[in-house]
Amino acid sequence: MKLRDEKAPWVERDTLVEASPEEVWEALTDEDRLEEWLAPDVELDPVEGGEIAVRDGDEERAGTVETVEEGERFAFTWSRPGEGESFVEFTIEALPGGSRVTVVETPTQSAATNTAGSTAMAAGGWDTRLIRLGRAMRFTPVA
């Protein structure tokens, strides 16, 4: 099944964090950790076919987990009610002293309503989220 529309505008952002790939993986796949940087209210079943729901104020997105490769790659589709769906993929690369986290968001083939403007908004959103992820990785909560 082809999820991404290769001709559609896309967003790619990355950041370096002072954390192991295992720590980053937890931040990407644990509801409590996601709430530290992605959105205040996250529900996630981190298995292929599982559901994801993200709420931040009046904004809500829901989707399906598509790829789970522990410690390396995590991907899902999500959409807001009445808007096109997009495919979000995180990859983790181990580096000396930390990890590189890359996120790519691409409209799916069913997302004919996506425009260059919505792509620019997505890019700004990921810039902010990755800054928050970096901060969350420095302040790992103690159980």
Region annotations inferred by a language model:
Residues M1-E43:
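Hydrophobic ligand-binding cavity/cleft-lining segments
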Residues E35-P81, F87:
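Glycine-rich portal/gate segments that line the openings of hydrophobic small-molecule binding cavities
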Residues W25, D127-L130, G134:
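Non-transmembrane alpha-helical segments in soluble domains
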Residues P21-E22, E66-G71, T91-R100:
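A short, structured loop/turn motif at beta-sheet edges
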Residues A19, A53-G57, S118-M121:
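Alpha-helical scaffold segments that form or flank carboxylate-/histidine-based iron centers
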Residues G134-A143:
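Short, highly charged C-terminal tails/helix-capping segments
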Residues W10-D14, P21, E51, E60, ...:
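Intrinsic-disorder/low-complexity, polar/charged segments enriched in Ser/Thr/Lys/Arg/Asp/Glu/Gln
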Residues W10, P81-T128:
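Beta-strand/loop substructures that line and gate deep hydrophobic ligand-binding cavities in soluble
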